[in-house]
Amino acid sequence: MMFERVLFLSVYLFSIGIYGLITSRNMVRALICLELILNSINLNLVTFSDLFDSRQLKGDIFAIFVIALAAAEAAIGLSILSSIHRNRKSTRINQSNFLNN
């Protein structure tokens, strides 16, 4: 019973993240939605690791790797966002045309 609830929560978080990523016009909001998607994937990894392979912790180790990857993605994304805001004075996605100055 608990397994289904966790999977429902994970699907719900993933759906919110995808919806926010598609409809977002702000780069910060898009980064937050991407982090939400990665966290829902981590929730699935830990849940399935506990359900199928509780002795070897392969899913837990992979989830820690995904958390480290998400932290690096957030740091790089925020630094790029800071540079775009400094040069363009806007963080809106539809106003960012990088092909022409």
UniProtKB/Swiss-Prot annotation:
Gene Ontology MF annotations: oxidoreductase activity, acting on NAD(P)H, quinone or similar compound as acceptor; quinone binding
GO cellular component terms listed in the entry, alphabetical order: chloroplast thylakoid membrane; NADH dehydrogenase complex
Membrane topology category: Multi-pass membrane protein
Keyword Translocase annotated: yes
One record GO biological process: photosynthesis, light reaction
Keywords: Chloroplast, Membrane, NAD, NADP, Plastid, Plastoquinone, Quinone, Thylakoid, Translocase, Transmembrane, Transmembrane helix, Transport
Gene3D superfamilies attached to this UniProt entry: 1.10.287.3510
EC category name: translocase
Subunit details: NDH is composed of at least 16 different subunits, 5 of which are encoded in the nucleus.
Protein family membership: Belongs to the complex I subunit 4L family.
Described function: NDH shuttles electrons from NAD(P)H:plastoquinone, via FMN and iron-sulfur (Fe-S) centers, to quinones in the photosynthetic chain and possibly in a chloroplast respiratory chain. The immediate electron acceptor for the enzyme in this species is believed to be plastoquinone. Couples the redox reaction to proton translocation, and thus conserves the redox energy in a proton gradient.
Record PANTHER family: NADH-UBIQUINONE OXIDOREDUCTASE CHAIN 4L, NADH-UBIQUINONE OXIDOREDUCTASE SUBUNIT ND4L
Protein name from the UniProt record: NAD(P)H-quinone oxidoreductase subunit 4L, chloroplastic
Species in which this protein is naturally found: Zea mays (Maize)
Upper taxonomic lineage: Eukaryota, Viridiplantae, Streptophyta, Embryophyta, Tracheophyta
